[in-house]
């Protein structure tokens, strides 16, 4: 019993003696309530007093800093935990109790909201609904957890920013030609431009995160310096056998571990958070140009650098390369900032111990080894870029196989695809192995220099002050020498570690250079294509030669703005119809107007009833009465035009010009089109958005949020499906409505059903003008007849592109493109002698083919007999 009572008394006596001998504070009669205030007041008094013993004052300062950091850590943790508890209690009160004994709420479908300023608010689910299996009856039931949604504010797009940044990217290469190569760094100039995207202003959140990271880096360096001193003091007390001092230092060790651990975790968290924020800024910047109304994502294929791996595998560039660039940027910053801060702090402290000569010798060693490593550093940036390009090729080929799996299966192309995939995989493995092989020799040299050479020299520099002091005084104090050696050794190791990480960062910078160049190339191309003066990849040298020849013939000076000379056609928007006048249909290429010409001087217009003309005509009829409200097309006359011709003659190219995704090269060419809301295009290949509902497919390109915001209802879509004979789709699913069903509609629907969905889109959007390209080639004859009559019944103005003469009966005008691919064409009204003659010629051609059927069958029989003999 006495032993049990003696233990607390001994512990109390030990604590009282620690306060008395270590910091000179007597706490015998102090109550716990006033203990903390008394301790802080006493420590502040000692740390400020010049009369106090230096050792006592140093201990007081260490305790104050440790208590402050521990208090900050504890306060932040308690505050965050309290906030979370209050938030949980509020949600528990607001939702479960309020909704008890009520019917379950309808699932929220709205994902974003457009503000008047152009900004958007998006709601992103954080926790997905999962299915849980009941342990009692093996029945699946939906989880009761509701989806947590995070509110994200997306600022409106500022086109002025992109117009300004376009010149920044353009001037980088121009500055390289102006400046001397000695003072020019391609990497630094590219990073300088990209940094304006990553951190737009000093008031940006990323700048605050960067400042916080620098603060914690400095804090970690100071803590490392303090731990080094404390380590030497602990070793000294152990050798001297001072038990009380050892216990006191050990308590300080455990106390300082709290802010040190918090600092290390905070640095990692801030680095990851900063990388994600950089990725958000860069991705939004890319998306604003890539997914713009100027159709940058399509026009990229015509840029001069379209064959570059960055643009050819642009999906890999936007996803993987951006992520790698942001991670590498934050990693390199941390790997450079921390060693630099360490070098400054440790050098200042070591200067007092080693002297100026010792610190100078350390830095001379750093510069020599840095020069050696820099000289033998392999081109890791170039190799990283090549590896990323090979990775993109391999990924895209697999993606192409997924998108065309059915076609490959029909062709039995497994062997060919396997060979190609194996070849791309071997190339990828070769690139990855090449990087590892190149790193092998460099890593061996790096380890020898940084780990062993620097450690050996560290022992030499750490022992210099001890040896010199012993020789000078003739006194050998083992305790003092041991403490100084431990402190100097630990600081030297930390300094060597800082230097080695600084040398390691040379390799990281080399890899970052490759990622930076790829991202900069991507943004440069996007800016060029996004520009209003994009010339579709026309090469200036070809244009200048052509311009000089033309100027020489006309005795004029050549113009210098070649980009403006490439595309010289005129586009008139918000026109009450579709008009093409004297337009040369030319495939976009580096030769611009000197490229492959498909159709010469194409001229037509709907919905005006014009006289039959041919390609020999210079212009269409006078449009001075275009504003007359009595004209048929202003009242929805249902004018129609059929563009007829063989494969490869340029029919679909006409649609591309009307949609403004192909340019008008010739100077006297005029394109007049209605506003975007009054024209609708149906391409050859029906498109279905991935992961969307049936409602999303019908209303495309309108979003579901806009659909409900504008007051539309599902019953209108049901009526449209009835009109296009697709109402049976609604009976496939079970539940409230099949319109909410999510499926891979591209594979679920047949070819004819997908084309009828296109007509459903026309019925929903109700445009004044529709351009259809082979929109019924997968539909039966009776359904085709019904759909075209549906367009005529609702008085749509439409242009059909086809190679089947059977569609002539549904149109008023016929534009026939020659079969000889000489660029000739003929426009005529259906029912005229020319149109009837054209139809008769088609019928005669079909009859001649039918007469040869018997001969073809005989040839097939003979071939089968020969094959049986073989």
From Swiss-Prot:
Q: Boundaries of each ABC transporter domain copy?
A: 608-866
Q: Which residues are glycosylated?
A: 142, 281, 403
Matching entries from SMART domains are given as: AAA
ABC transmembrane type-1 domain ranges (all copies): 210-501
Name the positions where ATP binds.
Answer: 645-652
Entry keyword annotation includes Magnesium: no
Subunit and partners: Forms a heterodimer with PXA2.
- Its recorded name reads Peroxisomal long-chain fatty acid import protein 2
Q: Which species?
A: Saccharomyces cerevisiae (strain ATCC 204508 / S288c)
